[in-house]
Amino acid sequence: MENILLKIKKLILENKIALFLTVYLVINTLFLTKYPFMHSDESWLSGLSRIYLENNSPIITESFFDLFPRFPHSIKIFFHYIQAFFSNIMGYNLFTFRFISLLFGVFTLYIIYKIGQKILKSKVSSFFLMLIVAFDVHFIYTSHFARQEAVILFSIIFAFYFYICKKPSLKKSIILGIITGLNIGIHPNSLFIAAIIGSLYVYDIIFIQKIKAKELLIYIFVTGIFAAVFIAINLYFDSNFFHNYKEFGDQFNVFAQPTDRISEIKNFYLKLYYQVSGTYYIPNIKFQLLFFPLIFALSFIKFIIKKDFSKYRYMGLIIFTILAINITYIIIGRYNQTSIIFIFPFFWMLFIINFKDIKYKNIISLLVAILVLIISIFNIIPFLNNDYKDYIENISKHVDSNEAVLANLNTEYYFSCNNLYDYRNLNYLKENHITFSEYINKNNIEYIVYPEEMDFIYNTRPVWNFIYGNLYYYYEDMQNFLENNCELIYRFDSPYAMRLSMYMYEKNWFVKIYKVNY
């Protein structure tokens, strides 16, 4: 018995990182669909992945948008096929698609541990680096969110690790170009990877002078080939790709003047600090947003004073990476709150590097890890009773999944493919010269799942017009139709009746289910 216990102890000690990551994975699955609240972006993405499978083709658009302008493209094609693969194995539900993000989150933590070993030369310090990132609420949020951020973050961290581990070579530049290029098929945020790798090359070319500029040019060339291929595929999918993509980008000020984009970065960070958002959840990251600038300032001052660019190479590379990410925010101009996670691991790396040579570094790291965990717990606990499953079950009691329905996109995981029509379509009734009632009849819609947020948005217009467009054109027609042509069959309260995150838990919001009378 004693020998068995000794073997178990030895196995645990030898595989403690794998054990930690396994436990981390299991614990996170327990509240994977509860934190954060489900966002319609998640069902939007997985809904298109389901359409890929249904039609055996990526040259398709979302079935829940018939009036809302959508055009086929290949920019997220790999991500959709990753989702389709997992959907075939685990079923079509929120847990499946969030589990993908969680897996990539766990892979990211392992690479962060390996980065720590490379730059810190200490397994203990590397473990604390991984632990702090794992406990960070925004990392947990990203690992629980069925969007592409977790995949892009993994690619960023892996590319950074690959760069610092491999000696300069043609092969290295080509592989980094391939990593960046493949991520174009995940999300346009692959630009962050390009900016980061470019900044690493620039640092080494200028300060270390052991890398030639041609290696950077090779990286740019390989990445450019992938970009050209994706552009060609997009033009094959949609001959008006450039025009349509520009129109889509205009909605998010992607093509705003450079001066406007530069000035907006201040508001970006202020909104994150004060948790100001539209429909996206923003965790309380005030501690990080106050702590990170202090760490950056300390690192930058040390880097400038020491002037030993070789000795402090890793610190310099991380500083350049953080600057590159911020410049990319400005270049893209969209300032999506979810993309802030790309910068977090690098700030935590700076923190660990700055304290790696002091006597009580492990105690300080442990205290910071505990503080970060406490902050995360206080962020997460309020959501543990917020079960998306309850929302869907309330609808399922009165509406069959095979019925045609007008509803919010956050119901998409319940309904069968091609049966859901989203409220975003209604903003295009006017330009299509049809009324609300004609739209319902045209699509043979049997049920209307009506969230109270529609009334709130209408009554506070134009403040929240960006959610569903201007409701003024069809709101009265919709209310008359609900009153005269429908029967109210069920009413229940749910936070999912309000998509605006700042109001979701302010009061009880209600969902009404109407049956259309034909």
What label would you give each PLM region?
Residues 46, 102-103, 142-143, 149-152, ...:
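Hydrophobic/aromatic-rich transmembrane helices and adjacent perimembrane loops
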Residues 18, 99-120, 158:
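Transmembrane-helix motifs of polytopic, lipid-linked glycan transferases
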Residues 51, 194, 198-310, 333:
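Transmembrane-lumen/periplasm boundary regions of multi-pass, lipid-linked membrane glycan transferases
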Residues 117-120, 157-173, 183, 355:
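Membrane-interface transmembrane helices that cradle and orient dolichyl/undecaprenyl
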Residues 190, 332, 354-356, 363-387, ...:
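Transmembrane alpha-helical segments
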Residues 18-22, 174, 178, 220-225, ...:
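Signature aromatic-anchored transmembrane alpha helix within multi-pass, membrane-resident enzymes
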Residues 27-31, 43-74, 78-81, 85:
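Extracytosolic helix-loop segments that constitute the early lumenal/periplasmic catalytic or substrate-binding loops
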Residues 355, 453-518:
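Aromatic/acidic, Gly/Pro-rich catalytic loop(s) in extracytoplasmic/lumenal soluble domains
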